[in-house]
Amino acid sequence: MILLYTFENKKENIRISSDFQLNGSMLTVSYLVDDKDQELEDFYPFEAAREISGTLFPLENLWTTTCFEIFLKNTVTNDYYEFNFNSKAEWNVFYFSDYRKRVESFKPDLDVKLSTRQVNGRPFLAFTVDIRSLANLKLPGQVNMATVTKGKAGISYWSQKHSGQKPDFHDFKNFSLILNSNEGKK
């Protein structure tokens, strides 16, 4: 698993690890949350052993609370997708033609699956989506794993890499992982 780091380097008792796996066109993104003091808001009570699937209704502004994210970018162009989901099975996907240039006409038609469980007493979330319908995504692609947490210490921004003077998951310098068919992180 990939350990995510807070931008602010706050003294929190939280650790977040993430991973991804592409098998054919099925992308599974997973997050393991170590929050023994249950500091996260809008996350507890954590409902383990839960599975929800189908064409779920996407929601806006998930990043205003605890939200798990993955960014998938083409290696040749600046097109990229941003997936957001939370422990309540709320999700969304956005398409950008370039840095922060959201294509408003993009309407996701994706079958998604969210599953939750406990791993050694810690919350584990997995989000699976068939990426075949993401026409502008070409493999191999670049990946940025990220999380926004809202807790007792306020809002924190987590990623495997932070490059700028402020947290910016869209910054292409943070897309440091590779997505290839039938492979996970590299």
Name the predicted role of every residue range:
Residues 53-110:
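Extracellular/luminal beta-rich ligand-recognition
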Residues 48-50, 59-66, 74-80, 137-186:
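Acidic/polar low-complexity flexible segments
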Residues 16-20, 24-45, 123-131:
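Short, well-ordered beta-strand segments enriched in hydrophobic/aromatic residues
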